[in-house]
Amino acid sequence: MTSVLIAGGTGMLGRSIASHLLDQRGVDVRLLVRDSSPRDPGKEGALQHLVSRGASIVAGDVSDPASLDQATQGVDVVISALQGRSEIIVDGQVALAEAAVRNGVRRFFPSDFAIDLFAAPEGAPQFDLRKHADALIDALPLQVVHVLNGAFMDMMLDPETAGIVNLQNNTARLWGTGDEPFNLTTADDTAHFTARLATDPEDISGVRTVSGAETTFNAIIAETERLADTTLAVQILGDADDLRRITAEAADPWSVIIQWYFLSMITVPPFTRTENHRYPELQLTTLNRYLTDAHQAHRVLQTQGQS
Protein backbone atom coordinates (compact mmCIF):
# COMPACT_ATOMS: atom_id res chain seq x y z
CA MET A 1 0.00 0.00 0.00
CA THR A 2 1.37 3.40 -1.03
CA SER A 3 0.04 6.39 0.90
CA VAL A 4 -0.15 9.67 -1.04
CA LEU A 5 -1.02 13.04 0.49
CA ILE A 6 -2.22 15.75 -1.90
CA ALA A 7 -2.11 19.43 -0.98
CA GLY A 8 -4.40 21.42 -3.24
CA GLY A 9 -6.60 18.42 -3.90
CA THR A 10 -9.75 20.50 -4.39
CA GLY A 11 -8.33 22.40 -7.37
CA MET A 12 -8.66 21.33 -11.00
CA LEU A 13 -5.29 19.59 -11.23
CA GLY A 14 -5.19 18.26 -7.67
CA ARG A 15 -8.53 16.50 -7.83
CA SER A 16 -7.62 15.00 -11.22
CA ILE A 17 -4.38 13.64 -9.73
CA ALA A 18 -6.39 12.19 -6.84
CA SER A 19 -8.85 10.59 -9.24
CA HIS A 20 -6.09 8.88 -11.22
CA LEU A 21 -4.44 7.66 -8.02
CA LEU A 22 -7.76 6.16 -6.93
CA ASP A 23 -7.84 4.28 -10.25
CA GLN A 24 -4.70 2.43 -9.17
CA ARG A 25 -4.79 -0.54 -6.84
CA GLY A 26 -3.14 -0.37 -3.45
CA VAL A 27 -3.04 3.43 -3.13
CA ASP A 28 -4.21 5.25 -0.01
CA VAL A 29 -5.18 8.77 -1.12
CA ARG A 30 -5.31 11.52 1.49
CA LEU A 31 -6.44 15.10 0.80
CA LEU A 32 -4.98 17.92 2.88
CA VAL A 33 -7.83 20.33 3.62
CA ARG A 34 -7.93 23.39 5.85
CA ASP A 35 -10.69 23.29 8.44
CA SER A 36 -11.21 27.02 7.92
CA SER A 37 -11.18 26.92 4.12
CA PRO A 38 -14.22 28.57 2.52
CA ARG A 39 -16.64 26.00 1.13
CA ASP A 40 -17.06 26.47 -2.59
CA PRO A 41 -20.05 24.32 -3.65
CA GLY A 42 -18.25 23.04 -6.73
CA LYS A 43 -15.11 22.13 -4.84
CA GLU A 44 -17.12 20.65 -1.99
CA GLY A 45 -18.94 18.41 -4.43
CA ALA A 46 -15.67 17.30 -6.05
CA LEU A 47 -14.19 16.61 -2.62
CA GLN A 48 -17.12 14.48 -1.55
CA HIS A 49 -16.95 12.56 -4.82
CA LEU A 50 -13.31 11.69 -4.15
CA VAL A 51 -14.20 10.64 -0.60
CA SER A 52 -16.97 8.42 -1.95
CA ARG A 53 -14.34 6.68 -4.09
CA GLY A 54 -12.09 6.01 -1.10
CA ALA A 55 -10.04 9.14 -0.47
CA SER A 56 -9.74 10.42 3.09
CA ILE A 57 -9.65 14.00 4.32
CA VAL A 58 -6.75 15.11 6.52
CA ALA A 59 -6.98 18.43 8.35
CA GLY A 60 -3.96 20.64 7.85
CA ASP A 61 -2.74 24.06 6.79
CA VAL A 62 0.60 24.88 5.17
CA SER A 63 0.87 27.87 7.50
CA ASP A 64 0.64 25.57 10.56
CA PRO A 65 3.73 23.29 10.88
CA ALA A 66 2.18 21.27 13.72
CA SER A 67 -0.78 20.31 11.54
CA LEU A 68 1.62 19.32 8.75
CA ASP A 69 3.51 17.01 11.09
CA GLN A 70 0.26 15.20 11.82
CA ALA A 71 -0.82 15.17 8.18
CA THR A 72 2.41 13.64 6.88
CA GLN A 73 2.62 10.79 9.39
CA GLY A 74 2.50 7.42 7.66
CA VAL A 75 2.72 9.03 4.22
CA ASP A 76 5.03 7.79 1.45
CA VAL A 77 4.50 10.51 -1.17
CA VAL A 78 3.42 14.15 -0.97
CA ILE A 79 2.10 15.96 -4.05
CA SER A 80 1.61 19.72 -3.97
CA ALA A 81 -0.88 21.14 -6.46
CA LEU A 82 -1.06 24.40 -4.53
CA GLN A 83 -1.54 27.79 -6.18
CA GLY A 84 -0.86 31.20 -4.73
CA ARG A 85 1.85 33.69 -3.96
CA SER A 86 4.98 33.55 -1.83
CA GLU A 87 3.29 32.59 1.44
CA ILE A 88 1.87 29.48 -0.25
CA ILE A 89 4.33 28.57 -3.01
CA VAL A 90 7.52 29.28 -1.04
CA ASP A 91 6.74 29.33 2.69
CA GLY A 92 3.90 26.82 2.58
CA GLN A 93 5.51 24.30 0.25
CA VAL A 94 8.84 24.41 2.06
CA ALA A 95 7.06 23.89 5.40
CA LEU A 96 5.20 20.93 3.90
CA ALA A 97 8.43 19.44 2.53
CA GLU A 98 10.22 19.90 5.86
CA ALA A 99 7.35 18.15 7.66
CA ALA A 100 7.62 15.38 5.08
CA VAL A 101 11.30 14.92 5.93
CA ARG A 102 10.61 14.83 9.67
CA ASN A 103 8.04 12.08 9.17
CA GLY A 104 9.91 9.83 6.77
CA VAL A 105 8.15 10.69 3.50
CA ARG A 106 10.33 9.50 0.63
CA ARG A 107 9.00 11.45 -2.40
CA PHE A 108 7.81 15.03 -2.88
CA PHE A 109 6.28 16.77 -5.90
CA PRO A 110 6.39 20.59 -5.79
CA SER A 111 3.65 22.45 -7.64
CA ASP A 112 5.53 23.06 -10.90
CA PHE A 113 3.33 21.68 -13.72
CA ALA A 114 4.32 24.20 -16.38
CA ILE A 115 6.68 25.01 -19.22
CA ASP A 116 10.40 24.73 -18.44
CA LEU A 117 10.16 27.20 -15.58
CA PHE A 118 13.87 26.76 -14.86
CA ALA A 119 14.57 28.50 -18.18
CA ALA A 120 11.84 31.14 -17.81
CA PRO A 121 12.90 34.81 -17.96
CA GLU A 122 13.75 36.39 -14.62
CA GLY A 123 10.95 38.50 -13.23
CA ALA A 124 8.03 36.23 -14.14
CA PRO A 125 6.45 36.08 -10.67
CA GLN A 126 4.72 32.71 -10.99
CA PHE A 127 7.96 31.05 -12.11
CA ASP A 128 10.37 32.98 -9.87
CA LEU A 129 8.45 31.80 -6.80
CA ARG A 130 8.57 28.20 -7.94
CA LYS A 131 12.28 28.34 -8.76
CA HIS A 132 12.96 29.76 -5.28
CA ALA A 133 10.84 27.11 -3.56
CA ASP A 134 12.28 24.32 -5.69
CA ALA A 135 15.86 25.26 -4.81
CA LEU A 136 15.04 25.05 -1.09
CA ILE A 137 13.11 21.79 -1.45
CA ASP A 138 15.78 20.18 -3.64
CA ALA A 139 18.26 20.65 -0.79
CA LEU A 140 16.20 18.40 1.51
CA PRO A 141 16.76 14.62 1.85
CA LEU A 142 13.80 13.66 -0.34
CA GLN A 143 13.19 12.25 -3.79
CA VAL A 144 12.01 15.54 -5.33
CA VAL A 145 10.18 15.24 -8.65
CA HIS A 146 9.52 18.23 -10.90
CA VAL A 147 6.75 17.58 -13.44
CA LEU A 148 6.89 19.82 -16.52
CA ASN A 149 4.13 19.56 -19.11
CA GLY A 150 4.25 22.80 -21.08
CA ALA A 151 1.09 24.88 -21.00
CA PHE A 152 -2.24 23.21 -20.29
CA MET A 153 -3.75 22.47 -23.70
CA ASP A 154 -7.32 22.83 -22.50
CA MET A 155 -6.71 26.18 -20.80
CA MET A 156 -4.65 27.70 -23.60
CA LEU A 157 -7.34 26.91 -26.17
CA ASP A 158 -10.35 27.80 -24.02
CA PRO A 159 -11.75 31.21 -25.08
CA GLU A 160 -12.67 31.90 -21.46
CA THR A 161 -9.04 31.63 -20.34
CA ALA A 162 -6.14 32.30 -22.70
CA GLY A 163 -8.43 32.61 -25.70
CA ILE A 164 -5.98 31.89 -28.52
CA VAL A 165 -8.84 30.67 -30.72
CA ASN A 166 -12.47 31.71 -30.36
CA LEU A 167 -14.86 29.82 -32.62
CA GLN A 168 -17.79 31.86 -31.34
CA ASN A 169 -16.62 34.83 -33.39
CA ASN A 170 -14.02 33.18 -35.67
CA THR A 171 -11.05 35.05 -34.24
CA ALA A 172 -7.56 34.21 -33.03
CA ARG A 173 -5.23 36.31 -30.88
CA LEU A 174 -1.54 35.69 -30.37
CA TRP A 175 1.76 37.13 -29.24
CA GLY A 176 4.96 36.80 -31.27
CA THR A 177 5.32 35.73 -34.88
CA GLY A 178 3.13 32.68 -34.41
CA ASP A 179 5.98 30.34 -35.32
CA GLU A 180 7.63 30.03 -31.89
CA PRO A 181 7.41 26.36 -30.74
CA PHE A 182 6.03 25.33 -27.34
CA ASN A 183 4.62 22.27 -25.58
CA LEU A 184 0.99 21.61 -24.66
CA THR A 185 -0.53 18.85 -22.51
CA THR A 186 -4.06 18.53 -21.17
CA ALA A 187 -4.49 18.96 -17.43
CA ASP A 188 -5.94 15.45 -17.16
CA ASP A 189 -2.99 13.86 -18.98
CA THR A 190 -0.61 15.79 -16.73
CA ALA A 191 -2.49 14.49 -13.69
CA HIS A 192 -2.41 10.90 -15.01
CA PHE A 193 1.35 11.14 -15.62
CA THR A 194 1.89 12.56 -12.13
CA ALA A 195 -0.21 9.82 -10.51
CA ARG A 196 1.86 7.14 -12.22
CA LEU A 197 5.11 8.82 -11.20
CA ALA A 198 3.87 8.97 -7.61
CA THR A 199 3.73 5.18 -7.36
CA ASP A 200 6.69 4.36 -9.60
CA PRO A 201 8.96 1.88 -7.76
CA GLU A 202 12.13 3.45 -9.17
CA ASP A 203 13.93 6.51 -7.83
CA ILE A 204 12.55 9.12 -10.21
CA SER A 205 14.10 12.22 -8.65
CA GLY A 206 14.62 15.19 -10.93
CA VAL A 207 12.78 16.78 -13.84
CA ARG A 208 10.16 14.65 -15.60
CA THR A 209 8.64 16.00 -18.81
CA VAL A 210 5.50 15.05 -20.70
CA SER A 211 4.03 16.67 -23.80
CA GLY A 212 0.84 16.02 -25.71
CA ALA A 213 2.02 18.26 -28.54
CA GLU A 214 4.88 20.46 -29.64
CA THR A 215 3.24 23.12 -31.76
CA THR A 216 2.99 26.83 -32.62
CA PHE A 217 0.20 29.38 -32.59
CA ASN A 218 0.11 29.37 -36.39
CA ALA A 219 -0.20 25.57 -36.45
CA ILE A 220 -3.10 25.73 -33.98
CA ILE A 221 -4.84 28.36 -36.11
CA ALA A 222 -4.30 26.41 -39.35
CA GLU A 223 -5.65 23.16 -37.86
CA THR A 224 -8.65 24.97 -36.40
CA GLU A 225 -9.42 26.55 -39.77
CA ARG A 226 -9.17 23.15 -41.47
CA LEU A 227 -11.46 21.41 -39.00
CA ALA A 228 -14.03 24.21 -38.90
CA ASP A 229 -13.78 24.94 -42.64
CA THR A 230 -13.46 28.62 -41.88
CA THR A 231 -10.96 31.47 -41.90
CA LEU A 232 -10.07 33.08 -38.59
CA ALA A 233 -9.41 36.78 -38.23
CA VAL A 234 -5.95 36.80 -36.62
CA GLN A 235 -4.88 39.63 -34.33
CA ILE A 236 -1.18 39.97 -33.49
CA LEU A 237 -1.05 41.51 -30.02
CA GLY A 238 2.68 42.26 -30.14
CA ASP A 239 6.09 40.61 -30.14
CA ALA A 240 8.53 39.54 -27.43
CA ASP A 241 9.94 43.07 -27.15
CA ASP A 242 6.44 44.45 -26.57
CA LEU A 243 5.91 41.88 -23.83
CA ARG A 244 9.24 42.79 -22.23
CA ARG A 245 8.26 46.47 -22.26
CA ILE A 246 4.82 45.80 -20.77
CA THR A 247 6.20 43.62 -17.98
CA ALA A 248 9.09 46.01 -17.25
CA GLU A 249 6.77 49.02 -16.94
CA ALA A 250 4.23 47.33 -14.66
CA ALA A 251 4.34 48.51 -11.04
CA ASP A 252 3.02 45.13 -9.89
CA PRO A 253 4.33 42.09 -11.80
CA TRP A 254 1.21 40.13 -10.83
CA SER A 255 -0.95 42.63 -12.74
CA VAL A 256 0.69 41.47 -15.99
CA ILE A 257 0.99 37.78 -15.15
CA ILE A 258 -0.64 36.76 -18.46
CA GLN A 259 1.91 38.81 -20.38
CA TRP A 260 4.71 37.19 -18.36
CA TYR A 261 3.29 33.78 -19.25
CA PHE A 262 3.16 34.49 -22.97
CA LEU A 263 6.66 35.98 -22.90
CA SER A 264 7.88 32.76 -21.33
CA MET A 265 5.96 30.62 -23.82
CA ILE A 266 7.46 32.28 -26.90
CA THR A 267 11.03 32.62 -25.58
CA VAL A 268 11.62 29.39 -23.62
CA PRO A 269 12.67 26.51 -25.92
CA PRO A 270 10.43 23.42 -26.03
CA PHE A 271 11.49 20.24 -24.27
CA THR A 272 14.46 18.45 -25.82
CA ARG A 273 13.16 15.11 -24.53
CA THR A 274 9.98 13.78 -22.96
CA GLU A 275 8.86 10.63 -21.14
CA ASN A 276 5.63 10.21 -23.06
CA HIS A 277 6.16 6.46 -23.39
CA ARG A 278 7.23 5.72 -19.82
CA TYR A 279 3.78 4.36 -18.99
CA PRO A 280 2.23 2.52 -21.98
CA GLU A 281 -1.32 2.85 -20.65
CA LEU A 282 -1.07 6.65 -20.75
CA GLN A 283 -2.42 7.64 -24.17
CA LEU A 284 -1.83 11.37 -24.43
CA THR A 285 -4.40 13.65 -26.04
CA THR A 286 -2.97 15.01 -29.28
CA LEU A 287 -3.59 18.54 -30.49
CA ASN A 288 -5.64 17.21 -33.41
CA ARG A 289 -7.78 15.11 -31.06
CA TYR A 290 -8.37 18.04 -28.72
CA LEU A 291 -9.23 20.47 -31.52
CA THR A 292 -11.49 17.90 -33.21
CA ASP A 293 -13.41 17.37 -29.96
CA ALA A 294 -13.59 21.14 -29.36
CA HIS A 295 -14.95 21.71 -32.88
CA GLN A 296 -17.56 18.98 -32.46
CA ALA A 297 -18.64 20.46 -29.14
CA HIS A 298 -18.91 23.89 -30.78
CA ARG A 299 -21.13 22.45 -33.53
CA VAL A 300 -23.40 20.85 -30.93
CA LEU A 301 -23.75 24.20 -29.15
CA GLN A 302 -24.53 25.91 -32.45
CA THR A 303 -27.20 23.33 -33.24
CA GLN A 304 -28.76 23.68 -29.79
CA GLY A 305 -28.77 27.45 -30.16
CA GLN A 306 -30.62 27.22 -33.46
CA SER A 307 -33.24 24.75 -32.24
Regions found by a protein language model. Name each.
Residues 239-307:
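A hydrophobic C-terminal alpha-helical subdomain
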Residues 2-46, 53, 63-66, 70-71, ...:
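Oxidoreductase cofactor-interface core, primarily capturing Rossmann-like NAD(P)-dependent enzymes
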Residues 81:
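Catalytic cores of nucleic-acid ligases and guanylyltransferases
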